[in-house]
Amino acid sequence: LVVHAESDLRSEDLPPGKQSHKLYSHVCMYTRTTGIWQTVWMEAVNPCGLERVQVFTDIDQNQIVVTPTFYKLSNGNRLAISVKDGGKVVAKSDVVAAQGIPVVMPIKKPKLWSPESPFLYDVVYEVKDAAGNVLDKVDAYVGMRKIHIDGTQIYLNNKPYYQRLVLDQGFYPDGVWTAPSDAALKGDIEMSMAAGFNGARLHQKVFEERFYYWADKLGYLVWGEMASWGKNSSSVAAARNFISEWTNIVVRDRNHPALVTWTPFNEEWEATTNEMGRFLTDVYELTRKLDPSRPVNTVSGGLYVISDFCTTHSYQQDGEKLHKMLFDGEKFYQPQAPGKINANTLDHLYYDGKVPYIIDEFGGIKCAEANPSKENAWGYGDAAITKEDFYKRLESQVKAIVSHSDKICGFCYTQLTDVEQEQNGVYYFDRTAKYD
C-alpha cells in the first residue's frame, strides 16, 4: 500500500489553519505540517460489521439512545448492546440490526459525567448472525452528561457552569502538529488543569481523537474547532471541501462527553458579500443537524451572523480599561464592524443580551523575564517586565472578566504554551514550567 499525501497551502481550496503560507513561520502563523500527521490504521472488519454509532445521553429521562450504522445488513443479524458500571451490567438490549434505527436504553440512577466526576460507563457492541455467531465486537464507553443553553447561561447537567478555558493550538517542537507520544497528549491536559483551567478551546487544528479520549477520562471540557484560516471563501471548491471535512469531523467526535461546543470558524471578517453570510449560516445549520446536542459557536470572535452564543476577542492589556470596555451601561464590548454587511444583504447582528456571552480570547501576555527578548518573539501589547508584573496584569484582566459573571459565563486565556515566536504561553514550548 502506497499513500501519497499532498496539501498545497497556496491553492486556498483546503483550509490550512495556522500553517504558514510563507517559507518560515511569522507572527501567529507557524511551521507547516507535511504528510500524514494523525494516527491511521488498517483493520479487518466483517462486511456486516458496525461502522459507527451516534450516542445521545438523556439525563432528564435517564436513558441512552444509540443510533447504529452498519457497513451492510444481512437477514437475521442482530445488535446486542451492554452498558456496564465496572463489572456490573446496568442496561442491555438485543435488537434486529437496522440502519439508523435508535435503540433506547434506560439507565437507573445514572452516574453523570462532569469535570469534577468524569464517570464513564463501559459499552460493548456485538453484531451477531442468525445463528448467534459474533460477527463484530466493539468495546467503547459513554459519559452521561447534558450541555444546554438557557437564557444567558450555559448549563452542564442542568446547572450553570463557568468555563475557565485556555487556548491550545496543539503545536509541538519536534512533530509540529504530531504529538511525540500518547503521554504527551495526556500531559497537555494535566498541565492545563494544574494551572487552574477546566477546559480548552482547541484552536485552528483538528486534534487527534486520542486527545478527546484523555479529556473524557480526566474531566476536561473542550471546544472542537476547524482549521478555518487560509481558505478562499469565494471559492466554490473551498466551500465544498470545508463542508465535507467539517461533516467528517463532527461525525467522528460527537460522542465524546468532554466536547461541549463546536466552533467551525475563527475570526471571519469578510463582511462584504452576502455569500459569506450564507456560508456561515449553512455550516451552522449543518452542524446543528449532525449534532443537536451541543451549542455551536459559529465564528469565534468575528462576524456575528448566526450562533448559539456570542464570543469576542480582546487583547486590551490594562485590566481597568478592559473592565470598562466589556460592560458600559447596557452595551457589551463587540469588536465587529457596525451596521450592515452592505445595503441589500444580511443585517449584521449585535449581541442583544439574550444569549450567553464569552470572552474566548484575551491575555496573550509575554513576560520579558520569563522569555528574554529574541528576534521576532512577541506577545500581545507591551511585554510584562517581570514575572510579578505578569501576575498582576493577569489578575487584573481575569478580575475584569469575572466581575461580570452574571453577564459573562466564561473565558478563554491565550494561551497554554509558547508556539515558536509567539511567546505568551503559560508554559514554554517544550512544556516545561514558566511560572509558579
Enumerate the predicted regions with their spans.
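Active-site groove signature of glycoside hydrolases
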Residues: 246-275
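Catalytic metal-binding/acid-base residues of hydrolase active sites
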Residues: 6, 227, 265-269, 292, ...
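Secreted/periplasmic carbohydrate-active enzymes, especially glycoside hydrolases
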Residues: 1-204, 208-209, 214, 218-219, ...
